[in-house]
Swiss-Prot record:
Gene this chain is encoded by: Lo2
Stretch list, region Disordered: 358-380
The entry's keywords: Chromophore, Disulfide bond, G-protein coupled receptor, Glycoprotein, Membrane, Phosphoprotein, Photoreceptor protein, Receptor, Retinal protein, Sensory transduction, Transducer, Transmembrane, Transmembrane helix, Vision
Official protein name in the record: Opsin-2
TM stretches of this protein: 52-76, 89-115, 129-148, 167-191, 216-243, 280-303, 312-336
PTM annotation (N6-(retinylidene)lysine): residues: K323
Biased amino acid composition, Low complexity: 362-372
Length: 380
């Protein structure tokens, strides 16, 4: 016999009228699908329905912001030739990862409003978690690629810029990087995807108390969070060191020549534009750090710490913060990247980004950084 609850939502009120008190999480999950819900969650009462409605509203707003922001990034890149530089391909790739994160949001909205459990059971849970896995891991390693690109561009302006072929190879590498820890739980090769928190989201299993789960969580933490984070910190540290060394070299050379500065206004504007773009990349990385660190902490506590500290609410908040970054990324880029900002303002004046000619000119000069700043470096 077909279980009709697989296809039709359970009225939300039923969860709150079934007994005098609130029932436990998993009350509306049939026995054949109960494996989706770890026993840890089944010890908590279902959250008040207003928590579900509130989360649905928050996710709907995030979905709208992400759709508009990432849509603008992809549209401007596709229709503006001057924007289509190798470096900006990394930003477009980041937008694509953010779009994958966007695709799972409608599932959570529907689940929160009508089901209060995983939509589509195992299949729906796998789709939701796989989208989140690719988006999260991909964003992390793509931020590392952006940091590498900024380091090469600013520290080696003559021959350090990545070619289009090199950028495409790195972008392909970011997608390949997402596969191991997405496919292994998806195909049940190692670990699996399960419901978590309010049972309206899914992720890899970090609660099963065995050695296999602990090793998996430790490996995915290193692969998707710690290693990209180390790369990013390394590249930005070296970038800052290179900029300081370059400025020191110019000051020393100017002192020897008894002049105030070796840089012309054009040189200064070109270098300033590249540094502004580096600041944008650093801001996006900081947002990634703030968004994904809480979730990384939850997973590590679940595998190695005191699981009693993990309540449904305490795990749903990090799940929300992990989605926020996909909404903010494009707006940070649109507001802070000079040429992109000018192009958006030209086409969408109602956004009132306030881009002036000076900023646009400054970024235009950045396309010649390898010539201007490079000449200064060569003169030393």
């Amino acid at each position: 016999m077909v279980n009709t609850t697989d296809f039709y939502p359970v009225p939300a009120a039923m969860a709150y009228e079934s007994s005098v008190g609130l029932p436990l999480l998993g009350w509306n999950v049939p026995t054949e699908h109960l494996d989706l819900v770890h026993p840890h969650w089944r010890s908590f009462q279902v959250p008040n329905k207003y928590w579900h409605f509130g989360l649905a509203f928050v996710y709907f707003m995030l979905m709208c912001m992400s759709s508009l922001g990432n849509g603008i990034v992809l549209w401007i890149y596709a229709t503006t030739k001057s924007i289509r530089t190798p470096s900006n391909m990394f930003i477009v790739n980041l937008a694509l990862f953010d779009v994958l994160m966007l695709l799972e949001m409608p599932m959570l909205v529907v689940s929160s409003l009508f089901y209060q459990r995983p939509v589509g059971w195992e299949l729906g849970c796998d789709i939701y978690a796989a989208l989140g896995s690719v988006a999260g891991i991909g964003s992390a390693i793509n931020n590392a690629a952006i940091a590498f690109d900024r380091y090469r561009t600013i520290s080696c302006p003559i021959d350090g810029r990545l070619t289009q072929g090199q950028v495409l190879a790195l972008i392909a590498g970011t997608w390949v990087w997402t596969l191991p820890f997405t496919l292994m739980p998806l195909l049940r090769i190692w670990s699996r995807f399960t419901a978590e928190g309010f049972l309206t989201t899914c992720s890899f299993d970090y609660l099963t108390d065995d050695e296999d789960t602990k090793v998996f969580v430790g490996c995915i933490f290193a692969w998707s969070y710690a290693f990209p984070l180390c790369l990013i910190c390394c590249f930005y540290y070296r970038l800052i060191g290179a900029v300081r060394e370059h400025e020191k070299m110019l000051r020393d050379q100017a002192k020897k020549m008894n002049v105030k500065s070796l840089q012309s206004n054009a040189d200064t504007e070109a270098q300033s534009a590249e540094i502004r773009i580096a600041k944008v990349a650093l801001t996006i990385f900081f947002l990634f750090l703030c968004s994904w660190t809480p979730y990384a902490v939850v997973a590590m506590i679940g595998a190695f710490g005191n699981r009693a500290a993990l309540t449904p609410l305490s795990t749903m908040i990090p799940a929300v913060t992990a989605k926020i970054v996909s909404c903010i990324d494009p707006w940070v880029y649109a507001i802070n990247h000079p040429r992109f900002r000018a192009e958006v303002q030209k086409r969408m004046k109602w956004l009132h980004l306030g881009e002036d000619a000076r900023s646009s000119k400054s970024d235009t000069s950045s396309t010649a950084t390898d010539r201007t700043v490079g000449n200064v470096s060569a003169s030393a």
